[in-house]
């Protein structure tokens, strides 16, 4: 059996997330596995670095799968891209060691969130919207507070009783990029919807609706003291994965 690693780029707008689901629900993983099954004539199960939510995109998701096929990885990917919708592209195929796992072998994941201040028919497809001016200095202050190891219980959709809610954030910063304000955040791992909850908290602070003190208390106690909602998925990209 060969272990094949690939990079997956996708526009998540029309997908119900990465993870395969039963029935007729269309997901990125499901589309790729069906196409691989046709090419390789065997049942394929993909592992991925991150299970992105409905509507979330990826610039460089990493995935791997095992196959008994003798086809070269480059031929597999060429055939794969001919079968997949244009909203999914596969690149950088390579055979890797049998113990490589896209999720478990990852050392760091980087996400970026693209934000605009007013709705836009052009720029809004791949962005969240704050619907008003923001105090970026306050948002930058909050981003800096996130660097380090914390319990992110207050910023996740996951069951509060589940263990393993500690994440180590290595970098977090807002920066301007053309029409967007972009959050770049890197960590060893992320909880479900964690980035989108953090973005919503920072937007609220940037509009004067959440204090830095309340934000810090949520981070320290793991208890949400403000009614947070995950920011729109359209602005979020899984940007890179380091091994």
UniProtKB/Swiss-Prot annotation:
General function of this protein: Formation of pseudouridine at positions 38, 39 and 40 in the anticodon stem and loop of transfer RNAs.
Binding-site residues for substrate, renumbered to this chain: 111
InterPro entries (UniProt xref): PsdUridine_synth_cat_dom_sf, PsdUridine_synth_TruA, PsdUridine_synth_TruA_a/b_dom, PsdUridine_synth_TruA_C, TruA/RsuA/RluB/E/F_N
GO BP term (any one): tRNA pseudouridine synthesis
UniProt keyword annotation of Isomerase present: yes
Keywords, in A-Z order: Isomerase, tRNA processing
Reaction catalysis annotation: uridine(38/39/40) in tRNA = pseudouridine(38/39/40) in tRNA
Native source organism of the sequence: Pelodictyon phaeoclathratiforme (strain DSM 5477 / BU-1)
Catalytic residues as annotated in Swiss-Prot or TrEMBL: 53
UniProt-listed SUPFAM superfamilies: Pseudouridine synthase (SSF55120)
Complex formation: Homodimer.
This protein's name: tRNA pseudouridine synthase A
